[in-house]
């Protein structure tokens, strides 16, 4: 997918780029698959900010996606490729012979007119087909992977993401995640074949502050620009550095400090992700 750039006729246009939308074939969405989501803008039920730098952003409707892929053994045809404002991947509208319509994540290479099918048993290994991990050959790349059977896909759902099946052990399948983490997933879990499309999304340059405001992202104020009462880095005459290691406003170390709590599922992780040296 091509990235469109602009001539620098304003300073904000100079570095701005957008994805080419020629792959989008639909002019409107299916009404029955749209719903409203309440925008919390980072506030809790008391109206207090619990997650900073968030706002409502542009108005948008949520597209109901079929993450479970539980319409088994019925072949559907891709009727349209659509834009989804709530995710960086494109979505595909699948129409089934009984008239049922569902949205799925569009894997790379899936186009209008192609057929997709989901089954609990084995299927041909084609892009967009969904089946249980135990029926997918070792070495295949998959996306939209369940963590618990029947719960719906939770892993590898962003643009350009995929996991690779590395092997099997007892009732588990070994997956190499997009982060390079190796972990066990129950072989009864469903997954879709292929890589999530729209791979060039990572190369888009936002270019100006207004685009982030439309996305619901507010500006971030540096701690060193605050007063001592507001941040551990605040205060000082003129521009001053931080004393000691950088920390969050609440004193948690900001660079490489582990904050992940232990979980029961930690035993399913074979090896953690590899950190880049830089």
Curated annotation (Swiss-Prot):
Superkingdom of source: Bacteria
Function in brief: One of the primary rRNA binding proteins. Required for association of the 30S and 50S subunits to form the 70S ribosome, for tRNA binding and peptide bond formation. It has been suggested to have peptidyltransferase activity; this is somewhat controversial. Makes several contacts with the 16S rRNA in the 70S ribosome.
GO cellular component, one term: large ribosomal subunit
Bias (Basic residues): 257-278
Chain spans, region Disordered: 212-278
Gene Ontology biological process: cytoplasmic translation
Provenance organism: Helicobacter pylori (strain Shi470)
Alphabetic keyword roster: Ribonucleoprotein, Ribosomal protein, RNA-binding, rRNA-binding
Membrane-spanning segments: none
Gene name, Swiss-Prot/TrEMBL: rplB
Family matches, as InterPro entries: NA-bd_OB-fold, Rib_uL2_dom2, Ribosomal_uL2, Ribosomal_uL2_bac/org-type, Ribosomal_uL2_C, Ribosomal_uL2_CS, Ribosomal_uL2_dom3, Ribosomal_uL2_RNA-bd_dom
UniProt similarity note: Belongs to the universal ribosomal protein uL2 family.
UniProt xrefs under NCBIfam families: rplB_bact
Pfam families per the UniProt record, alphabetical: Ribosomal_L2, Ribosomal_L2_C
Quaternary organization: Part of the 50S ribosomal subunit. Forms a bridge to the 30S subunit in the 70S ribosome.
Name of the protein described by the UniProt record: Large ribosomal subunit protein uL2
């Amino acid at each position: 997918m091509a990235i469109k750039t602009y001539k620098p006729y304003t300073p904000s246009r100079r570095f701005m780029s957008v994805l080419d939308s020629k792959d989008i074939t639909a002019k409107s969405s299916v009404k029955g698959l749209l719903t409203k989501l309440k925008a919390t803008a980072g506030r809790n039920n008391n109206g207090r900010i619990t997650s900073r730098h968030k706002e409502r952003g542009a108005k948008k409707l949520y597209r109901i996606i079929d993450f479970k892929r539980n319409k088994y053994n019925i072949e559907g045809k891709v009727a349209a490729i659509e834009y989804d404002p709530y995710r960086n991947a494109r979505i595909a509208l699948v129409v089934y012979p009984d008239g049922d319509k569902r949205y799925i994540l569009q894997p790379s290479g899936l186009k209008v007119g192609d057929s997709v099918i989901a089954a609990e048993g084995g299927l041909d290994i084609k892009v967009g087909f969904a089946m249980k991990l135990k029926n997918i050959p070792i070495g295949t790349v998959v996306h939209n992977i369940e963590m618990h059977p029947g719960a719906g896909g939770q892993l590898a759902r962003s643009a350009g993401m995929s996991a690779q099946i590395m092997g099997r052990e007892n009732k588990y399948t070994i997956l190499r995640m997009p982060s390079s983490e190796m972990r066990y997933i129950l072989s009864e879990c469903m997954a879709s074949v292929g890589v999530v499309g729209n791979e060039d999304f990572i190369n888009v340059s936002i270019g100006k502050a207004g685009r982030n405001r439309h996305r619901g992202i507010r500006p971030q104020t540096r701690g060193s620009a605050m007063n001592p009462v507001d941040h551990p880095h605040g205060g000082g005459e003129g521009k001053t550095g931080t004393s000691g290691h950088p920390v969050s406003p609440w004193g948690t170390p900001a660079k490489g400090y582990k904050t992940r709590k232990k979980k029961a599922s930690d035993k399913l992780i074979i090896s953690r992700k590899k950190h880049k040296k830089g």
